[in-house]
Amino acid sequence: MDETNGRRETHDFMNVNVESFSQLPFIRRTPPKEKAAIIRLFGQELVGDNSDNLSAEPSDHQTTTKNDESSENIKDKDKEKDKDKDKDNNNNRRFECHYCFRNFPTSQALGGHQNAHKRERQHAKRGSMTSYLHHHQPHDPHHIYGFLNNHHHRHYPSWTTEARSYYGGGGHQTPSYYSRNTLAPPSSNPPTINGSPLGLWRVPPSTSTNTIQGVYSSSPASAFRSHEQETNKEPNNWPYRLMKPNVQDHVSLDLHL
């Protein structure tokens, strides 16, 4: 269309008388169209204008930068919101004591308060323990061990009480804690060996009270001294005299301790 119009105009100018070139109109030629650059990609030819490509590249770059900036701004805003929420939660959070149910603003304050409660309870337990030990079993020197080990009975040797409980050495009675481990009295039928009855230990009446009182004396040194003196005076009667009624000769008993 442009070429035909140009030809018509030139044809009209030929018919018109023109005195000078200045009267001629100025007509610009249309620029020739550049051939589109051919791009081969994976064996296929792609045709596109360079101008379009150049204009598209900066626009894409601008859009990507705008998207990046918007995403960063959104992330920053989200972080600020999270920080504000954490601050609000910390301000609203209360640490409650398990003992008195009081609220504290920080965990450090709560820890110190609970440690004070624990110390008070330990002191209270110690005070209750000492009061219990003071009121229960005050006359027993071993009441502490009896409370801890549940051991309420004393254990004394039984040989000191067998003679007095069985055969009545004197009219003096022994204390109650000396007579707990006594044996039962012998039966009417004494034990026999090969048909012969065994003899029984008997305490002579002359030495029963003195010897046993010497054993029960408070000081052990005096008890052993009286024991040695009486054994030197009466060697045949100390410590006990064995009565053997109708014992056969062929029966021999070893009664040495």
Swiss-Prot record:
Tissues with expression: Expressed in developing cauline leaves.
Top-level taxon: Eukaryota
InterPro entries referenced in this protein's UniProt entry, alphabetically: GIS/GIS2/ZFP8, Znf_C2H2_sf, Znf_C2H2_type
Signal peptide as annotated in the record: none
Region spans: Disordered: 48-92, 108-128, 214-238
Biased composition (Basic and acidic residues): 66-92
UniProt key word Metal-binding: yes
Zinc finger (C2H2-type): 95-117
Keyword Membrane: no
MF-aspect GO terms: DNA-binding transcription factor activity; transcription cis-regulatory region binding; zinc ion binding
Annotated compartments: Nucleus
UniProt-listed GO biological process terms: abscisic acid-activated signaling pathway; cytokinin-activated signaling pathway; gibberellic acid mediated signaling pathway; negative regulation of abscisic acid-activated signaling pathway; regulation of DNA-templated transcription; trichome differentiation; trichome morphogenesis
A single cellular component GO annotation: nucleus
Induction behaviour: By gibberellin.
A Pfam family it matches: zf-C2H2_6
Purpose of the protein: Probable transcription factor required for the initiation of inflorescence trichomes in response to gibberellin and cytokinin. Is not involved in the regulation of trichome branching. Is functionally equivalent to GIS2. Acts as a negative regulator of abscisic acid (ABA) signaling during germination and early seedling development.
The protein's name: Zinc finger protein 8
